């Protein structure tokens, strides 16, 4: 019998946060417009996976048949023209199984392939839980990897502690299955560096008080960190998408994100 994920449905919270951020940050309007359209399709994919759970080895076929057509449709309707054109061309090419399979194996992919694979498979993982993700995925990220599927961390975030002067625990969120796990503070998620002098933190408190860049001078990588103590309404997965100025700031300092997000930033 398939182990299903928790009964919490994330879609309404993500929609509310995306709309709120789009109203506040004009630079994120285009990205969040596409993301809001994707959320509607991803909720349908999520429900389809719950209703007709595929076997782990059938995930590529399920994604192609049940998920990709809707992802392509909203990408054409709401996405940037370049991405929309590339997505349609890719959907009409051969080797769609490989498009999904390479993401499950964490192999190198063109931007459009990874976007399509992520958009199509993440709601299935969220619906069917950690054991399904572990069985469906074979590739394991270097450095810190998700204990559920082996994927790389997309971001880090701090939970509310319940006490004003107590810092909440730090978590990482998987780019592939969206699972979360605890991780030691002031430790690079890429190489394990712990020396404070090598771990700069950059932020822009006036515009983005809840998000900071967690950098590492040892491996020259970074993650965005979302602090719920600074904004309890934040939804880490959504906030990360809207922080292009912080991404550009980190890149200007020679840092590369551990893994680009859904839209390639």
Model-assigned labels for residue ranges:
Residues 1-136:
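N-terminal alpha-helical interaction blocks
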Residues 246-262:
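C-terminal membrane-proximal segments flanking the terminal transmembrane helix
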Residues 225, 261-265:
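Juxtamembrane/interfacial segments around transmembrane helices
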Residues 129-249:
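Cys/His-clustered metal-coordination modules, chiefly Zn-binding fingers
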């Amino acid at each position: 019998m398939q182990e299903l994920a928790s009964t919490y449905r994330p879609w309404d919270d993500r929609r509310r946060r995306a709309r709120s951020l789009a109203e506040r940050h004009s630079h994120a309007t285009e990205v969040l417009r596409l993301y809001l359209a994707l959320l509607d399709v991803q909720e349908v994919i999520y429900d389809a996976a719950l209703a007709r759970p595929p076997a782990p080895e059938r995930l590529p076929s399920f994604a192609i048949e049940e998920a990709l057509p809707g992802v392509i449709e909203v990408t054409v309707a709401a996405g940037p023209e370049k991405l929309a054109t590339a997505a349609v061309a890719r959907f009409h090419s051969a080797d769609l199984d490989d498009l999904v399979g390479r993401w499950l194996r964490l192999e190198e992919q063109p931007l459009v392939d990874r976007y399509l694979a992520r958009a199509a498979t993440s709601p299935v993982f969220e619906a069917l839980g950690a054991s399904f993700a572990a069985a469906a995925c074979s590739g394991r990220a270097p450095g810190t990897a998700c204990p559920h599927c082996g994927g790389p961390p997309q971001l880090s975030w701090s939970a509310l502690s319940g006490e004003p002067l107590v810092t909440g625990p730090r978590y990482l969120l998987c780019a592939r299955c969206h699972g979360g796990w605890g991780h030691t503070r002031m430790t690079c998620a890429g190489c394990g560096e712990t020396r404070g002098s090598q771990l700069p933190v950059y932020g822009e408190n006036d515009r983005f008080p809840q998000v900071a860049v967690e950098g590492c001078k040892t491996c020259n990588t970074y993650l965005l960190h979302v602090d719920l103590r600074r904004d309890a309404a934040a939804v880490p997965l959504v906030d990360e998408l809207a922080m292009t100025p912080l991404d550009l700031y980190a890149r200007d300092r020679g840092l590369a994100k551990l893994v680009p997000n859904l839209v390639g930033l």
